[in-house]
Amino acid sequence: METMIKSYIKKGKDAVLNTPEIERKVRDATSNDKWGPSGTQMQEISRASYNYECFPIIMGVIWKRINDPGKFWRHVYKSLLLIDYLVRNGSPQVIRDCRHHTMEIKTLVEFQYIEEEKDVGLSVRERAKQVIDLLQDDQRIKEERDKAKTNQNKYVGIGNDSRDFGYGGGSYGGGGYDSDSYGSNQRDSYGGNQRDSYGGNQRDSYGGNQRETTRRDSFNGRDEGYGNNNNNNNNNSYDSDPYSNTRAEYENYSNRAETRRNNEFGDDSNNSYNNNNNFNNNNNNNNSYNNSNNSNNSNNNNNNNNYNNSNNNSNNIQNNPNAASGGRSRPRAASGSGPSPATPNFQSSQQQQQPTLIDFSEPTPANKPMVFDPLADLASGMNNTNNNNNNNNNNSNSFGGFQSVNNNQNSFNFNNNNQQQQQQNNFLQLTQSNPQQSNNNNNNNNFFNQQPQQAQQFGQFQNSSMNKDPFAKDEFGDFAGANGNADFNPFDQQSGDFSNKNDGQQKPKDTNDPWSKKDLFDLSNLGNQNPNQSPVNNTNNNNNGNTRSQPARVANGPITSAGSTIPTMRPQPMMNQGFNGGMMNQGMGGFNQGGGMNNMNGMNQGGMNNMNGMNQGGMNQGGMGGFNQGGMNNMGGMNQGGMNNMGGMNNMGGMNSMNGMNQGGMGFNQSGANRNTNSMGSAGRF
């Protein structure tokens, strides 16, 4: 009762899991029941091992059973029995797979399990040793497999005629095992009931049951089948006239079809095929004559073949009109009445009518070089140029060309020399193209509203023109043109405006300029003329009529706000000029040679140019505020130290109290300035 319940549970589980049938058979053969696997189960499994689909399922279940724990020792033992049977009777691939798992089998040699005070593991250990010994001996495996085939042949003759080539009952089956070694078993494995379905009924339609009997008897080495009258009749049926005639008709049909295809494509080898057809037909007729057929039938067949050959030849003549000339005709269209193939002239005319693709192989017209400067002023950099050379492009834009075809459009060509004034602010151009400068904005007091001049280019050191304005013309570090500025007075200009030189015109007076209401001190009168005259109140009439104080100057070099000169590339012997107001004496030589205004980042490096002084916004910021903030502020502030607040140099401590100048820009010249206080006092008392 318990066994039935377990069997029902197994069936229900297999139905739910859709377990293959061969897997259920292997599980049943290696179950935990107290009885071993039956011969029928092992036989079915051995036959299924030849099937490539069933083989992995069989071996998978076996290796899973072998690795079960000790309480399922029956699974292990029955798996070893099944392996031993499959090595002897199953597929040769079982042997290779078992050798791959030799280590798993060797572990069973030490298998131990005690059940009900009995060492049930002993049977497992002994069986594992036997399987290992069998797998390691190839000669023994071959002998065992031959012996198994011999034992199977003993059961073949029993009920052989009654089963009519059927693998029925519990016997080992029909005569499949009687054939070659290793190969017959494989046919039997795929055979069984399947071979009956393919060989029994279907083969009977061609040769009948007698054919199978003859084949089986020939395999068994018996000649009884050939001695029977029925077998003789059946043998005649294999080579009988109807079969040979049918085959001849089939060959004739195939030859006619081949000839028809050759005729359609104009092959010249039709005669050879026809001759072969005659040869085949003659052979077929000879066979029919040997098989005791009437000569009339053979003659009729020959006549039919000749008729067929004549038809083939006629077909060749009809379908191959160019065969005599050796040419080949093209196959006709499917309709049979289509138009003739297009001639080469017609095809060429069609090709000429078809639109051609664009030919990119032609060389494109050369584009003019174009320079794009992103730093140029957009308001003035977009110059309207009338370029007549653009018409050479035939009003067609070349591929990749960025220059407009129209003559009146704005271009980005900044190298046009036709215009009088270019608004360039290029930091990369190191050569000056137009040395003549036009002063069109003479009355413009706003420094930032001035349009940049053509020659104001950063980094240009090759200016050879003798310009009188060092700040509007000379570039950064360009002191070669400072010799011709003898008539230039920086304090004659308004705040930040150095573009207007002495051009002979009277400059309008700006009431908002704080420097227009007062006069600067004049250092040119120090130690000269009237010692009692204050340099602040000293008035000199300029050529333009404006009252301005003339600062001290030297013959060579531009005048600075401090009264000294900016030395040119050639050092000036300023120390030997005499005792001119104390500023040029040997005691104050630190101003020139000590690096105060030149080397110590004074007017040129620190004040005017680098610190955005007079040229770039220094003096434009609120009158002398630029001097204090950007220019002379590094010197400690001349406004705060002495000149402005002290009211000039009337007081005795004028130059002595210029601590800002000594401590700021002339930091290391404190001793020099202080040391010269006496000379300043003696020379500058007025």
UniProtKB/Swiss-Prot annotation:
* SMART domains for the chain: ENTH (SM00273)
Please give the superkingdom of this protein's source: Eukaryota
Q: Does the record carry Membrane as a key word?
A: yes
Q: Where in the cell is it found?
A: Membrane, Clathrin-coated pit
What's the main place this protein lives? membrane
Q: Where is the composition biased (Low complexity)?
A: 269-340, 383-417, 527-547
InterPro entries the record matches: ENTH (IPR013809), ENTH_VHS (IPR008942)
- The protein, known as: Epsin
Q: Which organism is it from?
A: Dictyostelium discoideum (Social amoeba)
